[in-house]
Amino acid sequence: MSSASVERIAIHGPVGTLDAHLAVPAQLPGNGRPGIVVAPGFPAAAGGGANSFRTFPGLVERLASDARLIALTVAFRGLSNSAGHFSLNGWRADLEAALDRIKEVPGFDGSLWLMGFGTGGAISVSLAGDRDDVTGVIAFAAPADFQDWASRPRELLSHARRCGAISDPNFPGDFSHWAKELQGISTVSSAAKMAEGDKKLMVLHGGNDDAVPALDARAIADAHGSAELRIIDGARHHLRHDPRAIATAIGFLDRRGRPVQVTEPR
């Protein structure tokens, strides 16, 4: 039996209602618990494929039950039943709305964490670099930047239509502006800004990731300087489904990003 309760909630986002799930530990201490917002990645196929948002309520339930965190996951615009259509800056704004929402949950103690997968991981690092209220980030399979998309914006637009992240044939109204947003987020630069603010960072990546090279993970970790980097042997891109990656992340959260204490042999 889970020691956490999960409820589906609506978040008032910048362009409409965002589908979200909130998980809270069964018993909260008087001084409260930290909060974590979980950001999904870009859909792999129609309905989400391996990145389907349908799997994320189970993840926040586990974070609330095992790590004793107040955990919230949000479907960005264009995903699940959320209003709107995909744009990179739009997803970033949606994540900001989720961060503001978790602060309203009774029992939140003020310590705010982010966990993101793929594009969601990159956006999480980007926000953490700019916001003073974020304690740390766990980024799974995050790209170092979006230059690959920026070099092929029409191909990305076609994929977004196929997978349902954009359902309006007239969107975007200004294609050049939509495409230019892809050049505006650098995970590497944001990781360096996180370090300046003394914010914790764990970077996890699959050793056999065929979507984002593991070199991107190393670049992000190097830019931060003291990030914990974990390359999961044999794992591919969708680390949401790799129990080793999730267990490693929960361990990091349990110690709140503090370095592992190694006892010297006597």
Regions found by a protein language model. Give the residues of each.
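N-terminal cap/lid segment of alpha/beta-hydrolase-fold proteins
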Residues: 1-30
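The alpha/beta-hydrolase serine catalytic core
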Residues: 18, 134-219, 223-231, 235-236, ...
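Short, surface-exposed "cap/lid" segments of acyl-processing enzymes
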Residues: 27-66
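Conserved alpha/beta-hydrolase
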Residues: 58-81
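Alpha/beta-hydrolase fold nucleophile elbow
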Residues: 106-118
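Glycine-rich nucleophile elbow surrounding the catalytic serine of serine-hydrolase chemistry
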Residues: 116-126
